[in-house]
Amino acid sequence: MKLMKTEDAVGQVLCHDITQIIKGVTKDAVFRKGHIITEEDIPVLLSVGKDNIYIWEKDDTMLHENEAAQILYDMCKNDHMHPSDVKEGKIELIADCDGLLKVDCEKLKKVNSLGEMMIATRHGDTYVKKGDKLAGTRIIPLVIKKEKMETAQAVCSYGPILTLKPFHKKKFAVLTTGNEVYYHRIEDTFTPVIQEKLAEFGAEMIFHEVYDDDASKITDGCRRAMEAGADLVFCTGGMSVDPDDKTPLAIKNTGARIVSYGAPVLPGAMFLLAYTENGTPIVGLPGCVMYSKRTIFDLVLPRLVADDEVTAEELAGLGEGGLCLNCKVCTFPNCGFGKGR
C-alpha cells in the first residue's frame, strides 16, 4: 500500500472502498476496492475529502482489510448463519433460522484486545429471527500484518465465537396449582399467559390439570405430564413461602435436580428451575409471570426451547440488568433487562 496525492493517482488501483456520506441521504461506497482511477474520478475523490489516497502495492507480509474481514468472519461463523457481501472492509453475519444466539465472551474479548481488529456482536442468549444481523467484523487500518491475524485465529482454534441454536417444536404441560383456582374461587388467568408465550415458539400444550395445595398430587401430575410426552413442564403459582404454597416441595419430590429456587431478577425472584435425570425442565413460575409484561420467564424460556441448559451460575449472573423498569413503551428484548453476565 502506498500513499500518494489524489491528483497524481490516475491509472492507479484503489486498495480500499471510498465512502461518501450525505446526511440523511446516503452512506455508501462511490468507488470500490480494485477500481482503476481515471481523470474523471479526481473531482469526485476530492469532493469526499480525499486529497491524498492509498493505492495498491503488493506486500506478502500484509493482508488487505477485505481479506482480514473474511478471516474474522471465519472465526465467528457456525452452523445456521451466513456472511453478507464484504463492504467497506466489513462482513456481517446473518441468521439462517430462528434461534438462540450464544456468544463465547472470553474469545470475543481476547480477539478485540489484540488491537487493529474488531468483532461486534449482539448480546448472547438473545432470541433472534431468520435474517437478523448477528455480528459485524473488520480491521481498523486498511492493511494488517498476516502474523497478527494468525494470532487471532489461534484464539478460535478450538471453536468459533458464535453459536446459533435453532428452536425446537416443544410439547409442554401446565400444572395450575392453588386452592383458589381448584375450588373455582377465581378464574385461571395464568394458563393463557403461558400458552401465549409458548405460541411464539410454535410449542403445543398437550397436558393441563388443576390441583389443590397438595404436594403429592402436584408431584404425581408432573410425572404423568412427562409420561404423556411433555418436553417442558410448567407449574404455575404456589411459589412463595406461604404455608399453603407447596409447588417447590412438589417439584423436589419428583426427584428432579433443583438448579435454583430464587433468581436475582425482578419481576421473578421466586422462580424455580429443575431438570429431571433425562434433561426435561420442570419450572416453577411465580405469580408475577401472570401479570407483568416481562419477567424472568422471558429470559429463560428461549433457552429452554433451544435445549440450552441453564446453570445456577448463569442465573446468578442475571443480577446486573435483572431489574425491569416497566417502561411505558416496552422495547424488550432491545433493552438492558436480562443482559447481565
Residue ranges and their predicted role:
Residues 179, 206-338:
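Short glycine/threonine-rich loop/turn motifs
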Residues 158-213, 217:
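Glycine-rich phosphate/diphosphate-binding loop of Rossmann-like nucleotide-binding domains
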Residues 29, 85, 100-118, 126-129, ...:
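C-terminal terminal segments
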Residues 59-167:
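Extended, charged alpha/beta regions that create polyanion-binding interfaces
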Residues 1-88:
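Short, low-complexity N-terminal leaders and the immediately following helix N-cap/first helix
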Residues 32, 38, 123, 127-130, ...:
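Residue-level recognition of short, solvent-exposed, well-ordered loop/turn junctions
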Residues 7-11, 29, 83-86, 126-128, ...:
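Solvent-exposed alpha-helices and their adjacent loops that cap or buttress functional pockets
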Residues 55-56, 81-86, 144-147, 204-208, ...:
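Flexible, glycine/charged-enriched surface loops at secondary-structure junctions
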